[in-house]
Amino acid sequence: MKISPSPRKLSKVSTSVSFLISFALYAIGFGYFLLREDAPEPLAQAGTTKVTMSLASINTNSNTKTNAESAKPKEEPKEKPKKEEPKKEEPKKETKPKPKPKPKPKPKPKPKPKPEPKPKPEPKVEEPKKEEPKEEPKKEEAKEEAKEKSVPKQVTTKDIVKEKDKQEESNKTSEGATSEAQAYNPGVSNEFLMKIQTAISSKNRYPKMAQIRGIEGEVLVSFTINADGSVTDIKVVKSNTTDILNHAALEAIKSAAHLFPKPDETVHLKIPIAYSLKED
């Protein structure tokens, strides 16, 4: 059996055949055109002009020209480059160098004044110091008396006896000191010295502060008895005890001054006054 080809195959065959035929026709026309341009044209006879032109050549030339013109981009007119004017160089300002500050002259150090030699103090001649009687402040005694007055003590017979004994002892010491008084006062009668001693012992009081503290000692007092009976220049000449007893000795002489006998002439005396707590 014969099989007939399908319409698809037939259409493919016909298209390929038509393509080959059209390609062959185009190739023949193109070859003819090339041969036609290369063949020399016969010279025209005299008096006659013969111009032969083929439409294909005109069309092709015109097309090629138009295509060439269209293909060429229009050249825009180029702007001429402006000549740059040379910039004028501004004259540089000359910077003047700043003047250097002149160094200030250093002040010359002032010469220090030489210290003047101080005059050496002349050695002072020491005068012999007079032994003045040191008076004890009366405040302590006043306080003690005020305390005694404010607090009344019960006085017993024993206390009275003790005080009498102490007073007698102080009187004995003062009487016993008459021999010493005679040694300090040559040329004065014993009777006169005894009267002075008894007057002093009657007014002499042993300070309680000294008794409490157990202070003892001897005070040598000097004084002057004038012809009118006045007593002056009372002072402590020598002492081996405290100011409490020194003050008590001076007060004893001041209080007993009105009991002293009047001398015929001015007399300078030195009387030792002893204070002792020892019981015989």
Swiss-Prot record:
It comes from the Bacteria. Keywords: Cell inner membrane, Cell membrane, Membrane, Protein transport, Repeat, Signal-anchor, Transmembrane, Transmembrane helix, Transport. GO terms for molecular function: energy transducer activity. Residues 56-184 are annotated as: Disordered. Residues 36-280 are periplasmic. The keyword Repeat applies. The keyword Protein transport applies. Residues 1-14 are cytoplasmic. It comes from Helicobacter pylori (strain J99 / ATCC 700824) (Campylobacter pylori J99). This is Protein TonB. The chain crosses the membrane at residues 15-35. It is a single-pass membrane protein.
